Design a protein with these regions (language model features):
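A structural boundary/capping signal
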Residues: 1-224
Length: 224
């Protein structure tokens, strides 16, 4: 009997678990997040708790990230401050969060990249080509590209992740607490894939919320 490589096995398990927890978190926050597309810490912490429920002890990491969405010069989303060594202030709090387990990085917010690109285009009048917008990603830390490679290259689907200093991470995480009701809703959606959810974003017309909810509901019906 051929034994599976431990590294490959951990990556496979992490990818499976990430898919399981990403769906309910995405479904819930698309409907109800007060700061949709600026809520990475909430995404990561909810996912961390759900992973712990199934025995995966990942940790939330605060840092900086960039994603290459298309081949054009401007087809990049970057969450990188001008001075990554400076502590965050009220005037500039530019960061991203994701989950890490051993050598693996899991980001369940990448489904928001299209929305972020469209928001950026609305603000600056540009046009960002979005050829890559996965529901989530799981990558080995050693395969993450440099900021320069993502920013200046043209290979679609490349991502950059870099953890911030301990002091920076502490300042971002300090005082953040999950609402127990949010956790229970996410847990309910995880164990009940056919359950639907309608929240403030759906009612108030936040871009993409209705379409994303329809997608989630169609996926749920497929399980029936």
């Amino acid at each position: 009997m051929k034994h599976e490589d431990p590294v490959a096995r951990l990556e496979r398990v992490m990818r499976t678990v990430t898919a399981i927890v990403a769906r309910p978190v995405r479904q819930f926050l698309t409907a109800a997040s007060n700061h949709f597309a600026s809520d990475c810490l909430l995404h990561s912490e909810l996912a961390r708790v759900l992973m712990a429920d199934v025995g995966i002890e990942a940790r939330t990491v605060v840092g900086f990230a960039a994603w290459r969405l298309g081949p054009g010069d401007g087809d990049v989303i970057m969450h990188v401050p001008r001075n990554p060594d400076a502590l965050p202030t009220q005037q500039e709090v530019l960061f991203h969060t994701w989950l890490e387990l051993d050598f693996l990085i899991a980001d369940i917010t990448t489904y928001q990249l299209r929305f972020k690109a469209e928001s950026m285009d609305t603000a600056d009048g540009g046009h960002t080509s979005v050829r890559w917008c996965p529901d989530f990603i799981v990558v080995r830390r050693g395969t993450v590209r440099s900021l320069e490679a993502v920013r200046d290259g043209h290979l679609v689907g490349q991502a950059y992740y870099c953890a911030a200093s301990g002091a920076f991470q502490h300042k971002i995480k300090n005082g953040f607490e999950l609402d127990p009701e949010d956790v229970e809703i996410a847990r309910h959606l995880m164990i009940n894939p056919v359950a639907g959810v309608v929240g403030r974003n759906h009612v108030m017309g936040v871009p993409h919320a209705p379409a994303l909810l329809r997608t989630h509901n169609e996926a749920a019906k497929a399980h029936q």
